[in-house]
């Protein structure tokens, strides 16, 4: 679609371990036999969406374990080179989206709320400018931006992210007040 030859890609990043982001990973790995895929070490957690009417697994497909030699498991801040840095473990819950409330991690027989320890964000620096890539931004774009500023020592020049302000499982958007408050912080 973007006229990119995926066989020539030499590095990839997984934003988090929900199947709407990792669902195409096996197809990519079959097509491309060399790219390393950077992801958080917590990607193999048991992630679910839980609503009053369903409990469905939304984590990594077990077939992806066949490609573990291609995965680079990260934790915290990892500077790959002068251009690429991944970071995770975003603290804070400022302007946290209620859309996260249905997302859970199965631990034993319990389903506590997902802490998003499997989510990571990417900083790309080129020609003195830095862009932040934040996937769904489950940890909250305001909190992620604060962490990016801590890593960089300044705000990024551009942000590319989903803000996760809509819950597709419930068909419900966040209140206008939350959306406006997030917009004001940006």
Regions found by a protein language model. Give the residues of each.
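Active-site-proximal beta-strand elements of phosphoester/diester hydrolases
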Residues: 1, 84-90, 130-136
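Active-site metal-binding motif and surrounding structural segment of the metallo-beta-lactamase
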Residues: 2-44, 150-160
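Flexible, charged surface loops at secondary-structure boundaries
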Residues: 5-8, 30, 80, 124-125, ...
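Divalent metal-coordination and catalytic microenvironments
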Residues: 16, 37, 83, 134-135
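Active-site environment of divalent metal-dependent phosphoester hydrolases
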Residues: 18-23, 44-47, 79, 138-142, ...
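Metal-dependent catalytic neighborhoods of phosphoester/phosphodiester hydrolases
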Residues: 23-32, 54-57, 170-178
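Cap/insert and terminal regions of metallo-dependent hydrolase folds
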Residues: 36, 115-121, 125-186
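Metallo-beta-lactamase
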Residues: 43-120
């Amino acid at each position: 679609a973007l006229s990119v030859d995926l066989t020539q890609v030499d590095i990839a990043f997984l934003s988090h371990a929900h199947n709407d982001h990792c669902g195409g990973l096996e197809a990519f790995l079959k097509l491309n036999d060399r790219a390393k895929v950077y992801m958080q070490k917590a990607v193999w957690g048991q992630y679910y969406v839980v609503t009053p009417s369903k409990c469905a697994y939304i984590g990594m497909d077990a077939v992806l374990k066949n490609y573990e030699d291609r995965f680079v498991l990260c934790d915290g801040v990892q500077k790959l080179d002068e251009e690429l840095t991944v970071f995770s473990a975003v603290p804070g819950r400022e302007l946290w989206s209620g859309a996260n409330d249905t997302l859970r991690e199965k631990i034993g027989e319990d389903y506590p709320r997902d802490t998003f320890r499997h989510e990571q964000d990417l900083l790309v620096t080129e020609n003195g400018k830095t862009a932040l890539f934040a996937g769904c931004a489950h940890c909250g774009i305001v909190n992620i931006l604060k962490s990016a500023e801590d890593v960089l020592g300044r705000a990024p020049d551009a942000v590319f992210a989903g803000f996760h302000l809509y819950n597709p499982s419930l068909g419900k958007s966040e209140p206008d007040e939350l959306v406006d408050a997030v917009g004001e912080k940006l």
